[in-house]
């Protein structure tokens, strides 16, 4: 049974995970209107990204424009590609802003 509310689109976008005064670079691999799959350098993901934990993401669009997103971690695990270890995290977007939804819908139309 499919649990996602909307279809995902593969992307290659930069973002920042914001935690208080600290910022962490992350890369977004795919998105939907209500979710994001991101990867980041391995750094104890299960502590920073434990399921249910809320976090803020600042997503940079290809135009250079930035969108702030409040998200909730759904899952996190480490993966080991041939070159390096990364953390893979699934996020649910809490109340996605209209600007973000329009961006995702435009991606669907162009793919």
Residue positions per predicted region:
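Short beta-strand-centered aromatic/proline hotspots
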Residues: 25-28, 69-76
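Short conserved beta-strand and strand-loop elements enriched in small hydrophobics
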Residues: 13-18, 50-66
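Short beta-strands and strand-coil junctions in structured, solvent-facing domains, enriched
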Residues: 44-46, 79
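N-terminal helix initiation/capping motif
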Residues: 1-44, 105-111
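C-terminal output/interaction extensions
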Residues: 81-111
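Extended Gly/Ser/Thr-rich low-complexity repeat segments
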Residues: 47-59, 101-111
